Amino acid sequence: MASLGVYAAVTTLVALLLTYGIPLFLRECFPWQSLYKQRHGKPTVTTKSYEGRTVLITGANGAFGSRAAKLFAHRNVDTLVLVDVRDCGELKQEIEKELSDAGKAKPNILVWQADLMNFSGCQEVARKAQDLKTLDHVLMTMGILSFNRRVSPEGWETSIQINYLSGALLGLLLLPLLKSCSTNPNPPVMTFVTSFGIYPSSLTMGMPKNGSYLKMLSNNKDGMQQAHQYGRSKALLLYFTRELAERVSAVTVTSKLPHKVTINSADPGSAWTPLTAPNQDQLIPRLIQNFGSRAPEICAAALVNGVSASEDAHGKIMQDFDTTSYPPFMERKSGHVAQKRIWEETREEFEAKVPEVKAVYEMLDQI
């Protein structure tokens, strides 16, 4: 009889696990349906013309950034700003040749080489952007994926430096410069690139009771912790972007911003690129990558649509032609607490090292 009781208990436990436990785990850490949908999605650029507009792309030499630049160039963009740590001169020549061969007009292509591993590189880009007449679209595609821990000149683990801190700082510095041209019917858009990698990393995003949350995530070790750094850095960026969007909404109401601005995130989906190449040597990342991968050109089109969205996309995550929800852990009360903590710790770091960002924070202090 005792064995029958044990058998019944085990059977019940297994049934509960299959019915509730595994689906809950997948929803939290591996929503495979999203990957599957993106793998088979084939978005195309919905905006027919960018005539008169100015577009700035970071990570412009990357697989997504370079393809996005070409998509804009073939749609009559007026000024195309290519930002990367590597010289984008060759990309500029490729674009101009493609347009010449197609009998299309060439845009004004500006090549800004900047090392965004340093905050000074972000400041340099922002200073140059002050000379732009308009700034209709900012697409932040810069990013790194590293399975070996390194430290930036600013003292942060490099994934967190590039994927989060430098992108966030540059976004803040460019925010007051966003302005639509007369032929653009929508408010200017700033889009930060997010990633499915946030989900499997969510289990490692717990906050410490004491000390700096950002430092805890940055002071990681090689191995499994480093393997999650890409996802964790993207989670930080998504938290920041949501908070920034909320604050921009508040200051727009009070007219502290001269015009409406759309802040959103875009998920391009996954593709085999030089960025994701390190996954080839990692079994689980390689299997996940293979399950969801599609052509880089399709991913770039999704990003172009994201940064071309109307004001209805403010504060949302764009995915192909639609929006998608925030990860479950971000929607809980603890997620909103983490968001505020990240915002304040990031502010402390920036204001200590980048004096001009203080004015932007003061403008956003309305909530």
Segments from the language model and where they lie:
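Short aromatic-enriched loop/helix-cap "lid" or pocket-rim segments at secondary-structure transitions
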Residues: E124, S202-G206, L275-Q280, P328-R332
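C-terminal helical subdomain
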Residues: C122, L287-P327, H336-A338, A352
